[in-house]
């Protein structure tokens, strides 16, 4: 049994739809438990007890959302040296190009020593069914890799 933590923040509902699709994809892999939490509700224990992490954020002013940053702020020092090479993926709902949010998350993930296992998924503009299918694939890929122990 592997546990996948999906931490997200959503203002307009787009990132939440993406998070639900990531969760749906992860649940397609047998013996996978999915923990889906808004960033403000996610805890250090959630992070430490997961085998894989998916982080979802809207792009706000070219950066990640403040609630995702808050999650990182609350968990960084207590989790340091306890999450070495934890596999993670990122999904971003962007009005612009999303790269500012992506870079910010990647810099913080380096400090945690997380291991990115799939390229960031950035949905630009209006969310499409194709975007949601890519989110499901993202969730399945993360869950399958964790389940098989290849990350």
Map each language-model feature to its residues.
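Residues at alpha-helix caps and immediate loop-helix transition turns in enzyme cores, especially N-
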Residues: 18, 67, 101, 131-134
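Short hydrophobic segments within beta-strands
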Residues: 7-9, 37, 91
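Short helix-loop-beta junction
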Residues: 19-32, 110-115
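Glycine-rich phosphate/pyrophosphate-binding loop and the adjoining helix
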Residues: 29, 43, 115-151
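N-terminal beta1-alpha1 ligand-phosphate binding loop
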Residues: 2-26
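Helix-loop-strand module that forms the ligand-binding subsite of alpha/beta enzymes
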Residues: 39-118
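Residues at the starts of beta-strands that form the adenosine-phosphate
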Residues: 3, 33, 87
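A short beta-strand-loop structural module common to alpha/beta enzyme folds
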Residues: 31-41
């Amino acid at each position: 049994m592997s546990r996948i933590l999906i931490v997200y923040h959503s203002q307009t509902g787009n990132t939440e739809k993406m998070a639900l699709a990531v969760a749906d994809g992860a649940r397609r892999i047998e013996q996978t438990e999915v923990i889906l939490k808004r960033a403000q509700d996610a805890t250090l224990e959630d992070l430490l007890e997961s085998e894989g992490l998916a982080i979802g954020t809207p792009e706000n002013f070219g950066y990640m959302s403040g609630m995702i940053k808050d999650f990182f702020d609350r968990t960084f020092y207590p989790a340091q040296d306890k999450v070495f090479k934890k596999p993670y993926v990122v999904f971003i709902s962007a009005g612009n190009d999303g790269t500012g949010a992506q870079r910010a998350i990647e810099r913080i993930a380096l400090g945690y020593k997380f291991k990115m296992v799939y390229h960031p998924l950035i949905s630009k503009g209006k969310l499409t069914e194709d975007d949601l299918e890519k989110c499901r694939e993202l969730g399945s890929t993360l869950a399958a890799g964790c389940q098989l122990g290849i990350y």
